[in-house]
Structure formats: structure tokens, C-alpha cells
Amino acid sequence: MKTAVVLSIRGRQSYDGQEPDVIELVTDGVMEFRDGGWDISYEESELTGLAGVTTTFRVEPNKVVLTRTGALRSQMVFEKGVRHDSLYQMPFGAMMLTVCATSLFFDITPEGGMIDLVYTIDIEHAEAGVVDYHLDIQAK
């Protein structure tokens, strides 16, 4: 059964030689337990620069999978200490990304929970920076 939730999302992206970029967003979403894991989904907005995109965090016992569909498509797999390649599809083309979670913690219950994720990102095989996400999930 899907549960309506409120998501508080804070993302901090630090790229080599640049000031960190911080995005904070509070938005409505849905949460559902299925096939042994949690799916937490929401619609992106102009604020994130990803209008027309649906983002889903799939939380499984030892990993989190971030999937984006719509105006752009991507799937990134996060397991602590494991490097994962993914293709990031955008309207003007695709890029190869490699992500590696350096920190991954989550605690999800039917009432909500949280996800803390820190990962390094390589773009086209070149080290690009570090991304830090924190999601608070609250059932409505």
C-alpha cells in the first residue's frame, strides 16, 4: 500500500575547485514497501533543475538505488565502498557516471524515516566531486 509522505531533502554537491552547491527541498511524495524493500518517490521541480523528472529511492537491506525517469533517465546504485557505473541520459546526450558510497545509513519504518548518503562521483572516468544527501521522510 502506498503512503503519502512529506520529504525534506538536503543535497550538497562539492566539485573540485568550486564552492559547494546546496539544495534544500520540502515536497510531497509516496512511500511503499514491496519485494523486501522501500520505494520512496517524488516529482522533481524547477528548484532542483529537474522539472518533469520522477525520482525514486529504492532502499534494500544493504544498498540504495536512485532511479530517475521522465525528462532524463538514470539509475545509480549505492553500496558502501563499492563503485558502480551508470549511464546518465539527458535530452542532449548521455554521460558515464561512476559513484561510490563512502557513507550510507538509513532507517525506514511505515511512519517514515531517513536516508543519509555520501558518495564520490566520477564523470566520464574523471574524478568530479562529492555529493551528500539527507532525506527525512514523514508519513502524512
Segments the model singles out, each with a brief description of its role:
Residues H134-K140:
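Flexible glycine-rich active-site/ligand-binding loops centered on an Asp-His dyad
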Residues M1-I123, A128, K140:
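N-terminal intrinsically disordered, cationic/polar leader segments
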Residues V131:
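Charged phosphate-binding loop/patch that engages nucleotide di/tri-phosphates or the phosphate backbone
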